[in-house]
Amino acid sequence: MMACCLRNKRRMKGKLSWKSKKRDLSHSGNWAPEDDNDEGKIVFFGGSNYTFDLDDLLAASAEILGKGAHVTTYKVAVEDTATVVVKRLEEVVVGRREFEQQMEIVGRIRHDNVAELKAYYYSKIDKLAVYSYYSQGNLFEMLHGKLSFCIPLSMLLWYAVSKTNNSTFAGESQVPLDWESRLRIAIGAARGLAIIHEADDGKFVHGNIKSSNIFTNSKCYGCICDLGLTHITKSLPQTTLRSSGYHAPEITDTRKSTQFSDVYSFGVVLLELLTGKSPASPLSLDENMDLASWIRSVVSKEWTGEVFDNELMMQMGIEEELVEMLQIGLACVALKPQDRPHITHIVKLIQDIPTNFNL
């Protein structure tokens, strides 16, 4: 894919510089010998009409959307009319060449159900990925609520370096979702994951499927973001893997995620859509019982109706559809990887759910 490179030839005056000596370089990741003379550049993918550079990003108005273990996410308004999502990557464990190769694979993926990678930036000190912005927020926010706040991006970037608390910001912006909305999100996200798995000659893996990485596009279908980041950043701590509720039981290193484990994570998202429960929330007296285990336990007692979100149960005539989706979700979270369905089969199963909605 054709790309346009804009080199960072000047530093900001009076604002935090990417090259600031105050910055902590200990989390900059592996630094390959070929990187020594690279001062950093923004690479835009073909078809992008953006003209901003690094200084424009730093000076732009920004809103922090969340902070994960190795990624801090910002909503950034540039060029007056353009709004993008900027992800600042920490604990990057690959050199420039491998980083760029991964970004090029992601940058070639163009689909309505996959968030578009607009550009990336790589230097010795900082690594950024610039994605499309989705105004409706992510699925986690819709189901469980979340609060974000607005301060200048340069201050946020400095704050992110020293911040050690990996928790998200809780709020009350929960959005009621009817069954049609949840079904559209599920179908779209399944299609997006199928496209992702086709990339790199059918070998590509997302590695971090979860509701906070699923947005809705202009047609209200699910759209997957954050692809390409898992394999270039340090693996999540074991405590985070287990407590998140999304990762397959066989995964002990997120950099070694597989398409089978992606399907497991997607299955958890389906169960989250059906129950309205966060996979990370306590679900029983047993602290080790995650969402998938809790649902298996309830279903085994033939109390299937108890698992569904009360908001869904108030809708008439959708019980059979809910049960069919539940069966798909449970198939995805099979304990043995080889027992999980292929994502293309999952797409067909969801599309074949009989419904009165025009999807």
UniProtKB/Swiss-Prot annotation:
Q: Report the GO molecular function annotations.
A: ATP binding; protein kinase activity
Q: What are the record keywords, sorted?
A: ATP-binding, Nucleotide-binding
- In which residues is ATP bound? 65-73, 87
Give the top-rank taxon of the lineage listed in the UniProt record for this protein.
Eukaryota
Q: Where is the Protein kinase domain?
A: 59-357
Asked if the Swiss-Prot or TrEMBL record annotates the protein with the keyword Transmembrane helix, the reply is no
**InterPro entries recorded:** At_inactive_RLKs (IPR050994), Kinase-like_dom_sf (IPR011009), Prot_kinase_dom (IPR000719), Ser-Thr/Tyr_kinase_cat_dom (IPR001245)
Note the Gene3D superfamilies from the entry.
Answer: Phosphorylase Kinase, domain 1, Transferase(Phosphotransferase) domain 1
Coiled-coil portions: none
Per the record, the domain comment is: The protein kinase domain is predicted to be catalytically inactive. Lacks the conserved Asp active site at position 208, which is replaced by an Asn residue.
Family, similarity comment: Belongs to the protein kinase superfamily. Ser/Thr protein kinase family.
In Swiss-Prot or TrEMBL terms, this protein is called Probably inactive receptor-like protein kinase At5g41680
Q: Which organism is it from?
A: Arabidopsis thaliana
